[in-house]
Amino acid sequence: MISHTWRSAPRFIPAVALLLATIWAAPALQAQIAVSANDNKVVNIDGVNRIVENPAPDNATIIDLGASPPKVLGKVNVPTSVVGPPQSVAISPDESIALVVASTKIDPADPKKTTADNKLSVIDLKASPPAVTATIEVGGSPAGVSFSPDGKLVLVTNRGDGTVSILNVAGKTLTVAGKIALGDAKSGPSHVAFLPDGKRALVTRDGDHRISVLSVDGSKVEDTKQYLVAGIRPYSISISPKGDVAVLTNQGGGQGDTDIITVIDLKKNPPRIVDSISVGQIPEGATMSPDGSYVAVTIQNGSQRPKTHQAYNDHGLVMVYRINGTKLTLAAQAKVGGWTQGVVWSKDGKTLLSQGMLVNAIDVLSFDGKDLKVTGSIKVDGGPAGIRTAEK
């Protein structure tokens, strides 16, 4: 009957084709890409990090966070590392490319060890299937990576040599434009975040416990020599969409003590630290919600320790704080997979993804402003170590 109808009424074919095109296009319009970088080299066995013998390739999982529930779109092999903050991934504002850095690799001289790497990989997200189109050498042990708000500049923090690499972006092509030093080689630049106007960026330094302020003018990036001192080992950092406040994690001494997150008032010139809050053992990642009303923080919570350790817990945590000016108030928290890494938000602020290295999975959480609940899980190939969405 359908075939007969189409043959006898060909004038309806354009309308049907248009309808089908609309149906297929609708999900794409709502799509939001998240990319998880997964490390296959390192596993944690009862609190001890071990190198995997003949590991499978590291890879990146591409996820549609706009789908309900979020769904995997594909996977591409790409070098990466759990060493470093969970912002080892960046996605361009137009979601055309993703960048993944690799801080460590298997030591060619001794496959039972890892050694420093220096690679940044470019993934074409519009290709079918997605593919690595370039591998670029940056500094020693690259850790964090971010696009400028206009997508024309990329900054990479290099923990291994105390520098920040500068790359120009033209379409899907990246070109190294230079490098600046922050302190000495042991300053440990960990992550970099741009302010929304693109004229400044903040860099956490877990080696000497400072936060640097960079000035940005096109591809000219300079250290202003202004710096802030928060807690011990400042690590991940996230800046609100309005550019008025930043929240960063401080990893502390790693002895099982409670650690802190810190609030920076960006309206002040120079920026100033105005508050710190105790959150538990080793806050790893911090990500603002798209509207800047909340910040989600992942807490390792002792889950990466031996089971006999007094500070051991069998789960990590995601803690969501409500932001009111420069004050943070705990809104909700949930138990998640252990050795917890990065966290991202959906555009509407109702869904979060949290990485669990111990379980090779990403927890899917729902949030309604009051309750935070795990609603599902996405299995990945390896330990999920870094995750981002496009920051628009």
List where the protein language model places each region.
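Bacterial N-terminal signal peptides
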Residues: 13-25
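N-terminal secretory signal peptides that target proteins for export/translocation
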Residues: 1-11
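Predominantly soluble domains enriched in secretory-pathway, periplasmic, or organellar proteins
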Residues: 4, 27-392
